């Protein structure tokens, strides 16, 4: 290799190869045609182009002269035999009469060239196959059809024009759905909200009129975000195997320890300060009757309440390390702030300083680390990965990402849990859910907690897909929880104006409310809203926080609410919620940053578990494992428990 070539390759780096010569046409790639590299490349990089350099490469060998009859290896030409096969072709066809008549004069004696020209320019309908059986014709047709179908799919998924046509068609379908609902007298869950892409409530919709997209399009949508064109790298969660923590550390001591580890002897920016929406005690450092921690150097939040039937829930998308560092494109976040060595200790601080009883996490791809650290503080965890996590298509991944639930073992007892891969129109998607039944050790009362992470990306089709995932989620949690009080939380990737929000709040099977929307309301107003479903959802939507995620990516700045904590109002009383930092606190570069490890903010809610009503039942029927204590509950078919 000459010096020019070597220099060019060095400039491109080890992952990217320089493109020399002409590119092979897409049709040739679909036909699996092998090209001769000698016909494409030049070693005289930087030299003047020759006259032949602008000519397209020859994908088929065309001989200038036919073999002489006097040669020993001469065989009479037989155009019915295959001496130059295409993929999917079993025979050599005779050129059609048009090509024989209109062929240029210099090609008259070159039958192979005329034959190739005919195959390129003419369809099979104008040529008569020779010497083929019916079975051969059928197989050739099927193979040609597969090629045409592959080209059509590629065009359908990449064409901007066709994408607009599909979205326009979906808009008409949504309008048709609403017209049918009105004609049939089906009440819309949000009849006073102009969505443009609304949908009926999950469990009460008219199934026989539901739109179901073509299966090919559906499979494309549910897998969108997984890098299927790249090789899959099935790594396991092993990057934190060497983690060693001092034994017997209390929570304050552990927080101080991780602060020192994060700084490495150098002072680092402190975690963002946050407060609760309702005022707490004036002196947060008083430990009389409360398990409060002296955390003013970290945050001004108070630890979990000590009343026997109070529950503190922390919901958080912690940002997958693999995706955040290698794929999500946080253009304003310093590279060092995205490293796992920096982020993991901030994640621990954000969780432990709030002292939650139940922790629900999404985008977890370092479960062993959390299991080790939180396990030292008497938490136990359940993890369920995505079936086709996009992390697995990125080099140096730490295994798949998924959802996790942790619970405080000295306060709560695991009675059973279940996991599910959410389905969309009876097709498994790439999103998952976990549900767990927990029992209060102090009173014996039970409640269920469920978490999920719905499909990301914008657009009417994806909003409809999320809504269908929500319907399947409702069926799953209702079957598991029965009449037990329910906490349903997660990253729903949908703003309140999307159909999934109304689907969950308007579902008569669950009768849920939104914790952050209800926290400042009177108890009576929550239990008796005096409004129909549409008005109830509209009011709740307006009371949601302005944002739960605030980030800057390559495509622009995103600031919206897509994370929620839903609860059963008649059995759980919302007492307080952790507020979100203001824009000036976050900084102009937004999140993630040196002061916050994720692009989502954690949601922290305090609930009081109420005694059952006269018509209610303390525990409902549901699926999952049952046992007397958490050590007797084994892992489900898909999940893992530690």
UniProtKB/Swiss-Prot annotation:
Catalytic reaction equation(s): NADP(+) + H2O = phosphate + NAD(+); NADPH + H2O = phosphate + NADH
Cofactor(s) this protein requires: Mg(2+)
Residue sites binding substrate per the record: 363, 430, 453-456, 491-493, 600
Membrane-spanning intervals of the chain: none
Known outcome of mutating residue 491 to A: Decreases mRNA deadelynation and decay
Cofactor note: Binds 2 magnesium ions, but the ions are only loosely bound to the protein.
Stated name of the protein: Nocturnin
Gene: cu
């Amino acid at each position: 290799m000459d010096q020019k070539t070597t220099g060019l390759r060095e400039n491109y780096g080890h992952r990217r190869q320089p493109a020399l010569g002409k590119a092979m046409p897409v049709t040739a790639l679909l036909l699996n045609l092998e090209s001769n590299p000698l016909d494409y490349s030049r070693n005289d990089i930087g030299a003047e182009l020759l006259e032949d350099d602008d000519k397209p490469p020859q994908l088929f060998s065309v001989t200038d002269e036919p073999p002489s009859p006097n040669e020993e290896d001469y065989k009479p030409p037989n155009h019915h035999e295959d001496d130059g096969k295409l993929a999917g072709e079993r025979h050599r066809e005779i050129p059609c009469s048009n090509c024989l008549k209109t062929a240029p004069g210099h090609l008259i004696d070159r039958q192979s060239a005329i034959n190739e020209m005919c195959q390129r320019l003419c369809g099979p309908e104008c040529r008569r196959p020779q010497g083929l059986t019916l079975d051969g014709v059928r197989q050739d047709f099927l193979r040609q059809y597969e090629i045409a179908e592959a080209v059509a799919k590629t065009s359908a998924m990449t064409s901007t024009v066709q994408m607009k046509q599909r979205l326009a068609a979906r808009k008409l379908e949504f309008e048709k759905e609403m017209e049918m609902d009105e004609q049939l007298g089906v009440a819309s869950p949000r009849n006073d909200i102009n969505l443009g892409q609304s949908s009926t409530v999950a469990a009460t919709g008219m199934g026989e009129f539901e739109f179901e997209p073509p299966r090919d399009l559906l499979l494309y949508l549910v897998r969108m975000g997984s890098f299927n064109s790249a090789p899959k790298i099935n790594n396991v969660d092993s990057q934190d195997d060497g983690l060693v923590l001092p034994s017997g550390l209390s929570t304050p001591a552990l927080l101080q320890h991780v602060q020192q580890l994060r700084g490495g002897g150098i002072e680092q920016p402190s975690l963002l300060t946050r407060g609760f929406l309702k005022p707490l005690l004036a002196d947060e450092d008083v430990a009389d009757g409360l398990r409060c921690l002296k955390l003013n150097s970290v945050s001004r939040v108070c630890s979990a309440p000590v009343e026997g039937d109070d529950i503190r829930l922390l919901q958080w998308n912690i940002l997958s390390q693999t995706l955040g560092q290698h794929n999500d494109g946080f253009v304003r976040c310093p590279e060092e702030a995205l490293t796992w060595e920096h982020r993991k200790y901030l994640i621990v601080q954000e969780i432990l300083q709030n002292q939650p009883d139940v922790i629900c996490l999404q985008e977890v791809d370092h479960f062993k680390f959390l299991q080790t650290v939180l396990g030292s503080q008497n938490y136990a965890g359940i993890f369920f990965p995505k079936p086709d996590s996009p992390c697995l298509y990125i080099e140096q991944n730490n295994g798949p990402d998924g959802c996790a639930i942790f619970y405080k073992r000295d306060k709560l007892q695991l009675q059973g849990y279940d996991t599910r891969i959410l389905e969309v129109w009876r097709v498994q998607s790439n999103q998952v859910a976990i549900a767990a039944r927990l029992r209060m050790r102090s009173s014996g009362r039970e409640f269920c907690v469920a978490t999920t992470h719905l499909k990301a990306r914008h657009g009417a089709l994806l909003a409809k897909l999320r809504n269908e995932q929500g319907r399947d989620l409702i069926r799953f949690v209702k079957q598991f929880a029965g009449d037990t009080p329910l906490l349903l939380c997660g990253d729903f990737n949908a703003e309140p104006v999307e159909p999934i929000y109304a689907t969950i709040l308007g579902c008569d099977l669950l009768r849920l409310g939104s914790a952050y929307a209800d926290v400042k309301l009177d108890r009576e107003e929550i239990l008796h809203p005096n409004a129909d479903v549409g008005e109830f959802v509209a009011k709740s939507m307006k009371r949601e926080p302005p944002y739960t995620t605030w980030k800057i990516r390559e495509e622009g700045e995103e600031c919206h609410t897509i994370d929620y904590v839903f609860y059963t109002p008649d059995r759980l009383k919302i007492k307080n919620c952790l507020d979100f930092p203001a824009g000036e606190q976050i900084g102009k570069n937004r999140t993630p940053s040196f002061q916050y490890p994720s692009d989502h903010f954690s949601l922290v809610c305090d609930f009081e578990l109420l005694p059952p009503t006269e018509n209610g039942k303390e525990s409902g029927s549901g699926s999952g494992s049952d046992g007397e204590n958490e050590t007797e509950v084994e892992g489900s078919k898909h999940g893992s428990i530690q």
